[in-house]
């Protein structure tokens, strides 16, 4: 039987859910938000090997810690190619949102639209293109779990009116 463990931390102004998913000795980070130090400390009990960072979309509140994780752990970053312009606008959008400081804009290592799934720890992670919140939004399906970013909010659909 495959062991899957999910840890999450709500980070940043809008309490973005950042996830560490551990599957049979390998880990992925999903939507690491923008508080690298908090996440790195929280996830330090992780005894598994980080394999990659997967992002559901490119808004700044989901990608702020990506570059720090890439640099520290030498792992690739996966994002849908339709998110490139959103990613490039991250610091402008932070300013409009009234959030001080800047994030380091990460380079996309792999475009999610090129994959139907990826395998981590011997388990298939299905990649579903779910545009609406952003043009390149995706949902990750692992067994009966969905990681959908801002596709849904509590008791409502996610915003579809954001750049």
Features from the language model and the residues they span:
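Active-site HxH/HxHxD metal-binding segment of metal-dependent hydrolases
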Residues: 35-119
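Accessory terminal helices/loops
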Residues: 1-5, 74, 160-161
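Divalent metal-coordination and catalytic microenvironments
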Residues: 21, 31, 57, 69, ...
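Short, function-defining helix-loop hinge/capping sites that tune catalysis or transport
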Residues: 18, 39, 65, 88-90, ...
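Short, basic and Ser/Thr-rich N-terminal targeting/leader segments
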Residues: 14-15, 105, 121, 134
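Short Gly/Pro-enriched turn/cap motifs at secondary-structure boundaries
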Residues: 9-11, 107-109, 128-131
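Conserved beta-strand hairpin/beta-sheet module of binuclear metal-dependent hydrolase folds
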Residues: 2-46, 138-149
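Metallo-beta-lactamase
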Residues: 27, 93, 117, 124-163
